[in-house]
């Protein structure tokens, strides 16, 4: 494929935009470098770049797009609302309608508040948990990304009794000292951290199904034990469902798994492609938030009518019959096809799939925790990524990310993807 116009625009972008991108995940640094492809248009399962190339898209904006690009029903809703106004700074009926649809789908959201991103949602749930418990420390799991606020950009210490350290320049040591990081799916490490820190722990932050070092399921009983241990310690359980809400079924992962948290953060999919975030949970905890309580959270754009209208339209599409069955079927076809090709070409790789989402790891281990992904073959992934890109298959440029299917992908798209993977694997020997 020819990418000359993307290369030209990337050089121009570097003159004005720091690093040439507005999020570091969009650069190709993790796959060997080069100018990222500059996209011009999205339709359904496809993206079109400035050089006129067409791509089958499995990036899907890192997860928010589940109904395909420019879905007619959502696009129409956005256009209609834009003609009426996009921001009022007052309550609207749309906020009520959208909140009701969300609570009907996720019953644990007894009370809801909207923000503008997953980062804001998680940041605020931590503040609310601290206000409710009157404690400061939180526990998170290694490898899970919860946004770019100081509170969660913390790397693990050497063990469950060790405090974290900043995972980014600009994060104060004093902030990192309030965070303990333990391995996902390691209930003994979690138990040890709780026993050591005791009544200092306000909350534990959990991705019920991990989506930030690929797609990883909790081990049987893990989430149930986290809930029990936490509640026995007076510690709140916060689920980060920014990726998982409405990803696997019409609702949240918590309902699919049958384990209910105290608070939930959500975002990505529920905005229909527009900026959104939100959080909710038990009424007695949520009443800590202003104007009812002392925990302050506000936002000029929070609950704006454009995002509310898009979210309502998105849920109207997803609540139709057969949506998630199709995603699961396509995911199964893609997984089975890739596994056959891995065997055919004797490639060292494994796959984790959860319904219509999967991750291809270049390792011989079944991935259950972050360290396995950290030590997987990033160079091999980088080669695979570029070989696929040059055949019109758009993946996330990182070995840690997932492939996302949408309602608009077809069986023919899967066949074309597998044909491209067949060639890519053949060039990696």
From Swiss-Prot:
Q: Which residues form a coiled coil?
A: none
Residues carrying N6-(pyridoxal phosphate)lysine? 268
Q: Which domain of life is it from?
A: Bacteria
Q: What does the UniProt keyword field contain?
A: Cytoplasm, Isomerase, Porphyrin biosynthesis, Pyridoxal phosphate
Which PROSITE patterns does the UniProt entry name for this protein? Answer: AA_TRANSFER_CLASS_3
Which pathway is this protein assigned to?
Porphyrin-containing compound metabolism; protoporphyrin-IX biosynthesis; 5-aminolevulinate from L-glutamyl-tRNA(Glu): step 2/2
| UniProt-recorded name of the protein | Glutamate-1-semialdehyde 2,1-aminomutase 2
What organism is listed for this UniProt entry? Staphylococcus aureus (strain bovine RF122 / ET3-1)
